[in-house]
């Protein structure tokens, strides 16, 4: 449903942000 879709998008955005920060730190 809509709530699960929102949670999935939020989780994906959180992982993407974490990956971006990790990538910047590793450089």
UniProtKB/Swiss-Prot annotation:
InterPro entries: Dermaseptin_dom. It comes from the Eukaryota. Pfam families: DD_K. Keywords: Antibiotic, Antimicrobial, Cytolysis, Fungicide, Hemolysis. Disulfide bonds: none annotated. GO terms for biological process: defense response to bacterium; defense response to fungus; killing of cells of another organism. Has antimicrobial activity against the Gram-positive bacterium M.luteus and the yeast C.albicans. Has hemolytic activity on human and duck erythrocytes. This is Dermaseptin-like peptide.
């Amino acid at each position: 449903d809509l709530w699960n879709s929102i949670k999935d998008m939020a989780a994906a955005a959180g992982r993407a942000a974490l990956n971006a920060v990790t990538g910047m730190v590793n450089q």
